Structures are given as C-alpha cells and as structure tokens.
Amino acid sequence: MPEGPEIRRAADNLEAAIKGKPLTDVWFAFAQLKPYESQLTGQLVTRIETRGKALLTHFSNGLTLYSHNQLYGVWRVIDTGEIPQTTRILRVRLQTADKTILLYSASDIEMLTAEQLTTHPFLQRVGPDVLDARLTPEEVKARLLSPRFRNRQFSGLLLDQSFLAGLGNYLRVEILWQVGLTGQHKAKDLNEAQLNALSHALLDIPRLSYTTRGQADENKHHGALFRFKLFHRDGEACERCGGIIEKTTLSSRPFYWCPHCQK
C-alpha cells in the first residue's frame, strides 16, 4: 500500500493537472453523490490535501471530496477526451478543458461541508501528518511520551495512523534502522538522546522520501537521493556496520533489520 510520500506526490500530480481550472464536467458513480455533479460543474479545485492516506479535494464553493484509496483505489490523470484502457471500475471523474482526473476502484468516497470536515470519523482519528511542514520534532517527542502512546511497541505504533499519519511499513523499517532500534522498544524506555533522534527521524525520513520522488522502485532508489537502507534487502550487508540484514514479521507485516547494529 502506498505510504504518505507516495500519496502526497499523487496529490501533487492531481493538483498540477486541474487546480484553478473551471470544471467542465463532473461525474460520480455512487447515487448519493449524483446531486453534487451539477453543483461542482463550473467550480474550481482550490487545493488537494492529504491526511495520511486520505485525499481531500477542496472546491471553490466550500465543498470537499473525501476519498480513501484503501488497498485498490487509484487516481489517474489523462488528457480530456482520452479513453483509458483499463479493467478498473470508475468512481469519480473531474474534467477541465484540457485535463481530467479519474478515481478508480475506491469505495470510501464522501462529499463533506466545512463543518462535516471537523467531525468526520476518520479525520478525527488520524494523527498529525508527517509531511505537514508545521509539525516539529518537539511535538512528535511530546506525542511519543504521551500516556496514549508511551507504552506502545514501535513495531505497531509506527503503523498506527492515529499516532502519526502517513507512516507505513517501509518507513517503519527505515526509521528504526536510522536510530539503531528494534521494533520491540517503547518510548518510555528510551533515553533523551534516543528520543530526540527518533523524533527527528520520524519527520526527516518521510520528508526525504517525498522530496526525492517517493517510492520509485522498492528494491532500488527513491529517486536520485533516497535509497532503502534495509527494505527488501535481506541477506545483504548493512552499510552501517557490515552485518547481514534479516527479514522477519512484526505486526503481521514484513520487517527488515540488522541484528548487529539495531538493539
């Protein structure tokens, strides 16, 4: 499943295609959304926001389209008039004069008012987004040490979107390697230096992945700069210590680690 950096880059691509352009045609597959087709035609997409793995498409009339891709949903950008060759089921079409964005296969789609945005169940549960530039390491550290999270093992905590939105499995692996910790640790057991290092890594690594083009190839590189240190590299030598990277399962997900330098 795509993680925060990939979701944000997808949103960037959608924004680049249609932001600020009048919508010439709007289509929804679900009956409960049909009344909004006419309301949105002629409106502008003002921005596309990410909250973890959810997308919020904001329109100039104050409405917001909430969509969560879950496992199978995917957005596509096409030239207006193009007919894509796909077996996927179309759910949403937002068309402008030159570009059209399409949402396929997703089922978690809603139209929200500004007031409903503040009470939506998923948006209420989800934690601060690691790609939100306003989020600081100090705030992350306070969150780690809060009663809600301080007793949680990192193996599960770093997959929990209510802790920090946008994290996922490859980020969990890379963050824990960066700070030299295994997934069994808890925030309450770390010393000050470890807490500070983890608080920074929880923001620095997702942001590096995003700025260097996200998950381009799971085995190789995140664009030009971001390269997996451990993920999908079991059996290879750890570049920090020379130990052999191992693969196991933590919280029902594949986990890669170096037994020699992660303690």
Curated annotation (Swiss-Prot):
GO terms for biological process: base-excision repair. Keywords: DNA damage, DNA repair, DNA-binding, Glycosidase, Hydrolase, Lyase, Metal-binding, Multifunctional enzyme, Zinc, Zinc-finger. Transmembrane segments: none annotated. Its EC number is 3.2.2.-, 4.2.99.18. Binds 1 zinc ion per subunit. It catalyses: 2'-deoxyribonucleotide-(2'-deoxyribose 5'-phosphate)-2'-deoxyribonucleotide-DNA = a 3'-end 2'-deoxyribonucleotide-(2,3-dehydro-2,3-deoxyribose 5'-phosphate)-DNA + a 5'-end 5'-phospho-2'-deoxyribonucleoside-DNA + H(+). InterPro entries: DNA_glyclase/AP_lyase_DNA-bd, DNA_glyclase_Znf_dom_DNA_BS, EcNei-like_N, Endonuclease-VIII, FPG_cat, MutM-like_N-ter, Ribosomal_uS13-like_H2TH, Znf_DNA_glyclase/AP_lyase. Its cofactor is Zn(2+). GO terms for molecular function: class I DNA-(apurinic or apyrimidinic site) endonuclease activity; damaged DNA binding; DNA-(apurinic or apyrimidinic site) endonuclease activity; oxidized pyrimidine nucleobase lesion DNA N-glycosylase activity; zinc ion binding. Involved in base excision repair of DNA damaged by oxidation or by mutagenic agents. Acts as a DNA glycosylase that recognizes and removes damaged bases. Has a preference for oxidized pyrimidines, such as thymine glycol, 5,6-dihydrouracil and 5,6-dihydrothymine. Has AP (apurinic/apyrimidinic) lyase activity and introduces nicks in the DNA strand. Cleaves the DNA backbone by beta-delta elimination to generate a single-strand break at the site of the removed base with both 3'- and 5'-phosphates. Belongs to the FPG family. This is Endonuclease 8.
